[in-house]
């Protein structure tokens, strides 16, 4: 009986909070403030214009990734970020129900199909699930299903049963024999989907093995994560613990922590295994209570960067975290309000301070992301995956508010 009353109390609290949020949004619209959706519509229309200009100049890429100076940077389908822009358009279709976005999503997804047999990368989930995965979810086009199943089959060819993980990179062979990065956890969602669609347990077993091995070897006692773990492919033993995009091997690269939070939340959703939920909560606790976390909850690019507060932020880490927290709020009744309110606070900060001015930023929605500071690459710029998880967070927030 007490548990029933507790659940009712939580539901009432969330409902009250949601009603307040909806009333505030209506008030802002009446005052003439541009809604997040209207802002996104205008920005993407502008992005299409900028994309056409760059293509007309001879650029060969298929998808916008970022900006360099005053230039829109396009990438080939093999780039790990190639699926995010079409994913953004699928989310726009879902948010608006306007078939204009459906057609644009199809258009920008199409060139990525060839990646379904590209076995030299672990990024199949990012490229295929974010594009065709959303496309199949929203249209049930059987062609999209076939593309995804083939992609999942390609991805598991990189699995080493001795290590228990999917290999991340083939490059940097001089540093690692078998590197696995925390980002790789995000690609498991494609495998869980493939298992449900085909009933082939191989997909499930590979995903669970990778998640378990990563949980064992990637995380420190405080539940912060290393970026790269090097394995001996013959013995499965850990040989190195490093970073590639963070400040140092022992630092906490902000986006890496966000990948961990998001992916273990997803693993709990797909398996029902409580150890993944516990892992997600502990990672979330580390992120949200870190002394270097700014008040607006948009982290610096690394929680241990030496010149905080004079360090670049990483908006992409914030958007991934917000999206993950919205989902996590549906899984932990006793912390539902806390997680949702925290995600709401992140989104409020993004909308207030980190949203691009209309018809600027080459059409990207958000500013101030950091891709790879040690390599002096993509520092304090818009990056397409920040927009992707921002839109996903908007969708998840909308569903919770209903």
Where do the PLM segments sit?
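Bacterial Sec-dependent N-terminal signal peptides
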Residues: 1-31
């Amino acid at each position: 009986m007490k548990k029933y009353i507790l659940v009712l109390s939580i539901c009432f609290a969330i409902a009250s909070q949601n009603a307040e949020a909806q009333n505030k949004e209506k008030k802002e619209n009446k005052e003439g403030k541009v809604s997040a959706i209207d802002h996104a519509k205008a920005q993407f229309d502008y992005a299409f214009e900028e994309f056409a200009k760059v293509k007309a100049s001879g650029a060969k890429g298929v998808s916008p990734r970022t900006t360099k100076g005053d230039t829109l940077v396009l990438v080939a389908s093999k780039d790990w970020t190639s699926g995010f822009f079409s994913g953004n358009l699928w989310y726009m279709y879902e948010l608006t129900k306007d078939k204009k976005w459906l057609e644009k999503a199809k258009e920008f997804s199409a060139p990525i199909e060839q990646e379904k047999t590209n076995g030299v990368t672990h990024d199949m989930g990012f490229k295929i699930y974010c594009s065709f995965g959303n496309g199949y979810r929203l249209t049930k086009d059987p062609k999209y299903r076939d593309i995804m199943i083939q992609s999942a089959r390609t991805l598991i060819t990189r699995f080493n049963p001795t290590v228990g993980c999917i290999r991340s990179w083939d490059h940097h062979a001089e540093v690692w024999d078998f590197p696995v990065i925390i980002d790789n956890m995000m690609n498991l969602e494609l495998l869980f989907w493939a298992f449900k669609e085909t009933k082939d347990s191989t997909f499930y077993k590979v995903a669970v093995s990778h998640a378990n091995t990563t949980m064992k070897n990637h995380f420190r006692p405080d539940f912060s994560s290393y970026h790269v773990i090097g394995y001996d492919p013959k013995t499965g033993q850990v040989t190195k613990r490093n970073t590639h995009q963070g400040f140092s091997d022992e630092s906490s690269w902000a986006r890496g922590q966000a990948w961990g939070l998001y992916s273990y939340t997803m693993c709990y959703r797909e398996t029902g295994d409580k150890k993944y939920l516990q892992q997600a909560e502990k990672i979330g606790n580390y992120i949200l209570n870190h002394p270097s976390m700014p008040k607006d909850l948009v982290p610096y690019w690394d929680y241990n960067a030496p010149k905080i507060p004079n360090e670049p932020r990483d908006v992409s880490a914030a958007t991934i975290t917000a999206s993950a927290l919205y989902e996590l709020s549906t899984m932990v009744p006793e912390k539902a309000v806390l997680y949702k309110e925290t995600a709401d606070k992140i989104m409020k900060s993004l909308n207030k301070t980190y949203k691009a001015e209309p018809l600027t930023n080459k059409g990207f929605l958000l500013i101030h992301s950091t891709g790879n500071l040690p390599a002096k690459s993509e520092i304090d710029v818009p990056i397409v995956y920040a927009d992707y998880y921002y839109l996903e967070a908007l969708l998840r927030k909308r569903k919770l508010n209903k």
